[in-house]
UniProtKB/Swiss-Prot annotation:
The keyword Protein biosynthesis applies. CDD domains: S1_EF-P_repeat_1, S1_EF-P_repeat_2. This is Elongation factor P. Belongs to the elongation factor P family. Gene3D superfamilies: 2.30.30.30, Nucleic acid-binding proteins. Involved in peptide bond synthesis. Stimulates efficient translation and peptide-bond synthesis on native or reconstituted 70S ribosomes in vitro. Probably functions indirectly by altering the affinity of the ribosome for aminoacyl-tRNA, thus increasing their reactivity as acceptors for peptidyl transferase. GO terms for cellular component: cytoplasm. It comes from Halothermothrix orenii (strain H 168 / OCM 544 / DSM 9562). It is found in: Cytoplasm. PANTHER family: ELONGATION FACTOR P, ELONGATION FACTOR P (EF-P) FAMILY PROTEIN. The gene is efp.
């Protein structure tokens, strides 16, 4: 059992025999009433999203989730194929399950795949990834590091805001949690 005060994004819980993953949560306190936790939960069976409010401190059953080290190989249509680095077994995860995380997947990237009852439900990306800028407006003479920003399309198709001095072909470091530019690598 886990307290609703300990909720975090990615946590898997069991409610009424169905397993959900916490997508978003917010602790709230009303003026006279008690505190409560508003959540958005994703059903891992069908991908449906529900909103549920819990009383603060309420106990819910935590679903047991295994983590497997895997390597991302390629994508085929709407499916993304991963390989277990121990058994070389391959499995695919749908674009729907991965959501925005596909923007940071690079071929041959090592990561953790979360499994529930031997079925993949999600992935844990590294905190930072290095991606090449494929398309952006050219920098203009006189641009400075402390200047504005411009959109850049990365090799994975993700679009991030980058400083004006970044050019096509540059490799940049991106925070996978927020999608923000961190630094130029080369």
């Amino acid at each position: 059992m886990i307290s609703t005060n300990d909720f975090h994004n990615g946590l898997t819980i069991e409610l009424d025999g169905t397993v959900y993953q916490v997508v978003k949560f917010q602790h709230s306190k009303t003026g006279r009433g008690g505190a409560f936790v508003r959540t958005k939960l994703r059903n891992i069976e069908d991908g449906g999203i529900i909103e549920k409010t819990f009383r603060a401190g309420e106990k819910v059953k935590k679903a047991h989730v295994d983590q497997k080290n895997m390597q991302y190989l390629y994508h085929n249509g709407d499916d993304y194929v991963f390989m277990d680095t121990d058994t070389y077994e391959q499995l695919s995860i749908s674009n729907e399950q991965l959501g925005d995380k596909v923007d940071y997947l690079k071929e041959n990237m090592s990561l953790e795949v979360l499994m529930y009852e031997n079925r993949p439900i999600d992935i844990n990306l590294p905190t930072f990834v290095e991606l090449e800028v494929e398309k952006t407006q050219p920098g203009i003479r006189g641009d400075t590091v402390s200047g504005g920003s411009k959109p850049a399309t990365l090799e994975t198709g993700a679009v991030v805001q980058v400083p004006l001095f970044i050019n096509e072909g540059d490799v940049i470091k991106v925070d996978t949690r927020s999608g923000e530019y961190i630094e130029r690598v080369s």
